[in-house]
Amino acid sequence: MTQQKLYISDVTLRDGSHAIRHQYTVEQVKQIARALDDAKVDSIEVAHGDGLQGGSFNYGFGAHTDLEWIEAAASVVKHAKIATLLLPGIGTVHDLKAVYEAGVRVVRVATHCTEADISRQHIEYARHLGMEAVGFLMMSHMTTPQHLAQQAKLMESYGATVCYVVDSGGALSMNDVRDRFRAFKDVLKPETQTGMHAHHNLSLGVANSIVAVENGCDRVDASLAGMGAGAGNAPLEVFIAAAERMGWNHGTDLYKLMDAADDLVRPLQDRPVRVDRETLALGYAGVYSSFLRHSEMAASKYGLKTVDILVELGRRRMVGGQEDMIIDVALDLLKQQEHERIRSEPVSSEAN
């Protein structure tokens, strides 16, 4: 494993968009893409945080369109492939054709971990266009390793040449990661690659990525300064430093990544991307990481604690795409608080 070239997939310009509410400027995209390309990452994923056509009232509107961001990145990249993310039902095959013409050569088709069957049309069309099609199984902690592997097998049968364990909630332990990659290797074709997309909500983003590689993972997602939803993704520069110390062949320039993380990306964070009370609650409760900023807004609006909203979302097993339910949960918590207040009030009695 130490001699095999790891495929380094950067997600700063897609998952990282969540951290700043999808407000990257075109110039920022160019600067970051140029720095990543100069550091020789293998692919650079570009899109709204929720994938192609993710800009909406539900998810939040971006400062620019997906095509504007993609064209900006493609205009400065010489080495890396431009990648993007598509959620079936949000992005369409028409969007795939448009981004292919704009320079995208890798598409990650993302579904909930038990819904791989909805990816067929988009994976098949991506292959028809000549794109590399990647199966991306989100919230992978919410099903068993064996069932997850069967879902990956479905994506493989549709034409995916890579299948990912996606820890959207940052809730997987190192043993959980190991078990999922072993299950993948048991059922997927030898030529089908596997990938790891970690989140750092339990501070395990880098550790889980290392365990994944130790169990046969071919591709690792990471972002500069951990820029991503929740407590962020595995910080790219940290993972590369660890990989370097372990003697792994990653092919990137560590110092250029360190400079880009601190000089270009960290200054953009209006809310620090870190493990804190709220982002820890995401990992603890197993909640979709991009729910963070939406839950913070709801908590502020209704005078609630963000942690209480996140824990309740986890209890209800909400998944990506159910952002509209965050307000429902907040209102339910308000009602519950009001009922508890009424019950706790002393009952007044009139004197005879």
Swiss-Prot record:
What is the name attached to this protein's record? 4-hydroxy-2-oxovalerate aldolase 1
Residue numbers annotated as active site: H18 (proton acceptor)
State the EC number(s): 4.1.3.39
For the keyword Membrane, the answer is no
Q: Which CDD domains match?
A: DRE_TIM_HOA
Provide the species name. Answer: Pseudomonas putida (strain ATCC 700007 / DSM 6899 / JCM 31910 / BCRC 17059 / LMG 24140 / F1)
Does Manganese count among this protein's keywords? yes
Q: In which pathway does it act?
A: Xenobiotic degradation; toluene degradation
Site (Transition state stabilizer) found at: R14
Q: Write out the residues that bind Mn(2+).
A: D15, H197, H199
Q: Which Cys pairs are S-S linked?
A: none
